[in-house]
C-alpha cells in the first residue's frame, strides 16, 4: 500500500480463487468472502476464480461471523460489503486501520438499530491492493499466509490469548476465545487492527478458522500446488475429512506484474 502522496508502483494483475462452505455440522454459513466488488456469503458448491487488473484500490478478504452469537451471518456480510465498497478511501496504512475501526462502529450502530442482533460480530483477514502496493490486515483469528516454496509464512496476527512469539504475533493456538473482533459483546471502545505492508507480487492464502483449526500450516501447505482451483478443493476436502465442524472459507490470491 503506498504511503499518501507516494509514487505508484508497477501495475499488478490479480487472480483470486474463492470458496466458502457451511461445513458438515453448522446449520448456516456465517462466513463471507470478497474479491473486489464480488461478495459471497452463501455456501458454494465449487470455487469461483476472478481476475482483475489493479487500476484502483480493492480488497480480497474472508470474514467469519462469531459462532454462537446472534447475527454472525449478518455481521460478516456487513464487514465484507463495507470494506469492499470503501477500499478506495484508504490511501495509506493509517487510513486502512481507520476504515476497519469505522466498520467496527457500523456493527455497533446496526445493533442499536436492531436490538435482536445485539452481540453480533465478525473477524476479518485480507489483502488491500492498489496501484502503489499491498497491505495485509486482520482483526480476530482469520488468517493470511504468504505461500512460498518452503511453506507458509503467517502474515496476520491472531487475536487470541495464546502465547506470543518474538515478533509479537500469537503462536498457533486453537481456542474459541478472541481478544478482539469487529462488533461482538464488548463495549464499542475501539479496536487495534493489524495492518502490515507487504511487497508484491506474491501468492497468498486467506482463510477462516474452519480451515486452520483442522489443519496445521504444514498440512495446509501439503495440499497447495500450482493449480489454484484444485488446491482450494483439496483444502476444503481435508478440512471436511477432519470433521468439518465449522464454516470453511478459503481464498487463494496471486499478484503478478500486469
Residue ranges with predicted function:
Residues 1-258:
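PP2C/PPM-type serine/threonine phosphatase catalytic domain
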Amino acid at each position: 500500500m503506498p504511503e499518501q502522496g507516494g509514487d505508484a508502483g508497477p501495475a499488478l494483475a490479480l487472480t483470486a480463487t474463492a470458496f466458502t462452505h457451511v461445513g458438515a455440522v453448522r446449520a448456516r454459513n456465517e462466513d463471507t468472502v470478497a474479491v473486489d466488488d464480488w461478495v459471497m456469503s452463501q455456501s458454494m458448491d465449487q470455487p469461483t476464480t476472478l481476475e482483475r487488473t489493479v487500476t484502483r484500490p480493492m480488497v480480497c478478504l474472508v470474514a467469519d461471523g462469531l459462532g454462537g452469537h446472534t447475527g454472525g451471518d449478518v455481521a460478516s456480510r456487513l464487514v465484507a460489503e463495507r470494506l469492499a465498497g470503501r477500499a478506495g478511501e484508504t490511501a495509506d496504512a493509517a487510513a486502512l486501520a481507520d476504515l476497519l475501526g469505522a466498520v467496527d462502529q457500523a456493527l455497533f450502530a446496526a445493533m442499536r438499530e436492531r436490538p435482536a442482533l445485539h452481540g453480533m460480530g465478525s473477524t476479518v483477514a485480507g489483502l488491500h491492493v492498489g496501484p502503489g502496493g499491498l497491505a495485509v490486515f486482520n482483526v480476530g483469528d482469520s488468517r493470511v499466509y504468504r505461500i512460498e516454496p518452503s511453506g507458509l509464512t503467517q502474515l496476520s496476527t491472531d487475536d487470541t490469548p495464546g502465547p506470543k512469539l518474538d515478533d509479537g504475533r500469537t503462536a498457533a493456538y486453537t481456542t474459541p476465545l478472541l481478544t478482539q473482533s469487529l462488533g461482538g459483546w464488548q463495549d464499542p471502545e475501539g479496536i487495534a487492527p493489524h495492518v502490515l505492508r507487504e511487497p508484491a507480487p506474491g501468492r497468498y492464502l486467506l482463510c477462516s478458522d474452519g480451515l486452520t483449526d483442522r489443519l496445521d500450516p504444514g498440512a495446509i501447505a501439503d495440499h497447495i500446488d500450482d493449480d489454484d482451483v484444485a488446491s482450494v478443493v483439496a483444502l476444503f476436502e481435508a478440512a471436511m475429512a477432519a470433521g468439518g465442524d465449522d464454516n470453511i472459507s478459503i481464498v487463494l490470491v496471486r499478484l503478478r506484474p500486469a
